[in-house]
């Protein structure tokens, strides 16, 4: 039974209406408004190829804390070329202006000032990468099983909302899963998100590289030109595993594109998956023979000695070792991931995207049905405290910050990540 703290999802896949939506539909562009007139800039959070992110508080009676994402115009050398915004920036603004769900980051407004775009979001104090990192210091101690369950449920709840509205996220990873101080999960950074309802061209033709390498689904690694919301569910499986083990389950090295922008076969990442999940074959993934990189997979299998490549899945032993080393009970009981947790993980990490569990099916899984109510506050019952985001005050001039343009190069955008967390990830 699901807790009453979750009024958003019902058993038939719909969403209960709320008396007070978090904002009016169509929140969007605000003209003739200056950022500093509405917001006091507290300090600098992080930066990337898109621009910079600052923490702010509202002025003139507008309460609350905000994260202001400043997009920079494209630059060529020292000359700024006002050539418009990147596709990713336009998508993020368009989608965030329409989406409204408790488990998706909330956009307050968009401001245009001096040919710069500012996206004003609600402020979130934590993200999953910070939380995972906290549990590795000074020595490893597990994230409580009840917290993992709440995090995963809220994440899937937000993902169901996105998929129901024909939105693929395409960059789910711990750094992009935000957590408020009250323990609410928000899916953030929709810079790579896009609508997938009747696309005019294949999704591959628009963005040849999607999803950070450690969380990239096997169909993407195998060069699939057409993919589905299943790519987001694989990433959720990777995040679930990382919450339990406190380290990425498939930590491969990314092969970079050559000068001709040819997407290479990610051999090392595929091997990391095979080491745990076994070699994919027609029995567990019938469509694999039609994948563009299938010959590369065959070559990879033949290049390794027969006893040096796993033909069957080792996920079960990985999971048991994870529970044992993490201090969880290996038996299925209240407060531990147990057998239900393994079944959900294995269905999220199904090689075949056509049989991989959906967000709706996952929310109805026994892992959530059994074990009592799920709190909408993932910190409920947790006696420890997580450190706040690192905010620097020596670089808080939102008007003068100078960085590259809005265009992404690969997948660098950990927009609300602290500097320390970025260094840890690298």
Swiss-Prot record:
SUPFAM superfamilies linked: Protein kinase-like (PK-like) (SSF56112)
Record key words, sorted: Activator, ATP-binding, Kinase, Magnesium, Metal-binding, Nucleotide-binding, Nucleus, Repressor, Serine/threonine-protein kinase, Transcription, Transcription regulation, Transferase
Active site: 171 (proton acceptor)
Documented EC number(s): 2.7.11.22, 2.7.11.23
Signal peptide interval: none
Predominant place of localization: nucleus
Catalytic activity line of the entry: L-seryl-[protein] + ATP = O-phospho-L-seryl-[protein] + ADP + H(+); L-threonyl-[protein] + ATP = O-phospho-L-threonyl-[protein] + ADP + H(+); [DNA-directed RNA polymerase] + ATP = phospho-[DNA-directed RNA polymerase] + ADP + H(+)
Binding site for ATP: 45-53, 69
Broad class of enzyme this protein falls into: transferase
One MF term in the entry's GO annotations: protein serine kinase activity
All residue ranges annotated as the Protein kinase domain in the record: 39-368
Biased composition (Basic and acidic residues): 389-398
Entry-linked InterPro entries: CDK (IPR050108), Kinase-like_dom_sf (IPR011009), Prot_kinase_dom (IPR000719), Ser/Thr_kinase_AS (IPR008271)
GO CC annotation: mediator complex; nucleus
Region ranges (Disordered): 389-426
Cofactor names: Mg(2+)
Compartments (UniProt record): Nucleus
Function: Component of the srb8-11 complex. The srb8-11 complex is a regulatory module of the Mediator complex which is itself involved in regulation of basal and activated RNA polymerase II-dependent transcription. The srb8-11 complex may be involved in the transcriptional repression of a subset of genes regulated by Mediator. It may inhibit the association of the Mediator complex with RNA polymerase II to form the holoenzyme complex. The srb8-11 complex phosphorylates the C-terminal domain (CTD) of the largest subunit of RNA polymerase II.
UniProt record similarity statement: Belongs to the protein kinase superfamily. CMGC Ser/Thr protein kinase family. CDC2/CDKX subfamily.
Oligomer status and interactors: Component of the srb8-11 complex, a regulatory module of the Mediator complex.
Name this polypeptide is given: Serine/threonine-protein kinase ssn3
Species in which this protein is naturally found: Emericella nidulans (strain FGSC A4 / ATCC 38163 / CBS 112.46 / NRRL 194 / M139)
Gene: ssn3
């Amino acid at each position: 039974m699901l807790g009453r703290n979750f009024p958003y999802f019902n058993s038939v896949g719909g969403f209960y209406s709320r008396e007070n939506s978090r904002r009016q539909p169509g929140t969007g562009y605000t003209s003739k408004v200056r950022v500093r007139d509405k917001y006091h800039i507290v300090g600098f959070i992080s930066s990337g190829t898109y621009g910079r992110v600052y923490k702010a508080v509202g002025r003139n009676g507008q309460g609350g804390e905000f994260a202001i994402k400043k997009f920079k115009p494209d630059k060529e050398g020292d000359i700024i070329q006002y050539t418009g915004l990147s596709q990713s920036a336009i998508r993020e603004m368009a989608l965030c202006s329409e989406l409204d769900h408790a488990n998706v980051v909330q956009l307050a407004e968009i401001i245009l000032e001096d040919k710069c775009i500012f996206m004003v979001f609600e402020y979130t104090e934590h993200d999953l990468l910070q939380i995972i990192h906290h549990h590795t210091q000074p020595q490893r101690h597990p994230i409580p099983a009840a917290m993992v369950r709440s995090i995963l449920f809220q994440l899937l709840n937000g993902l169901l909302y996105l998929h129901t509205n024909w939105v693929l996220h395409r960059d789910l990873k711990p750094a992009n899963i935000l957590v408020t101080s009250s323990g609410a999960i928000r899916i953030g950074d929709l810079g790579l998100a896009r609508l997938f309802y009747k696309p005019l061209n294949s999704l591959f033709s628009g963005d040849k590289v999607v999803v950070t390498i450690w969380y990239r689904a096997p169909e993407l690694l195998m060069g699939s030109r057409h993919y589905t919301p299943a790519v987001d569910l694989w990433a959720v499986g990777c995040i679930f595993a990382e919450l339990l083990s406190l380290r990425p389950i498939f930590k491969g090295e990314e092969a970079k594109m050559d000068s001709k922008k040819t997407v290479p076969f990610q051999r090392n990442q595929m091997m990391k998956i095979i080491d745990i999940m076994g070699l994919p074959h027609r029995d567990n993934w019938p469509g694999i023979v039609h994948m563009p990189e299938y010959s590369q997979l065959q070559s990879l299998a033949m290049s390794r000695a027969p006893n040096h490549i796993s033909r069957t899945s080792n996920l079960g032993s990985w999971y048991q070792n994870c529970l044992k080393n993490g201090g969880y009970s290996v038996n299925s009981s209240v407060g531990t991931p147990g057998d239900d947790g393994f079944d959900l993980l294995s269905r999220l990490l199904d090689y075949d995207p056509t049989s991989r569990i959906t967000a709706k099916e996952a929310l109805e899984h026994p892992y959530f049905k059994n074990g009592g109510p799920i709190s909408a506050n993932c910190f409920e019952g947790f006696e420890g405290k997580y450190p706040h985001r690192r905010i620097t005050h020596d670089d808080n001039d939102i008007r003068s910050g100078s960085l590259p343009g809005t265009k992404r190069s690969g997948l660098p955008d950990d927009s609300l990540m602290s500097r320390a967390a970025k260094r840890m990830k690298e």
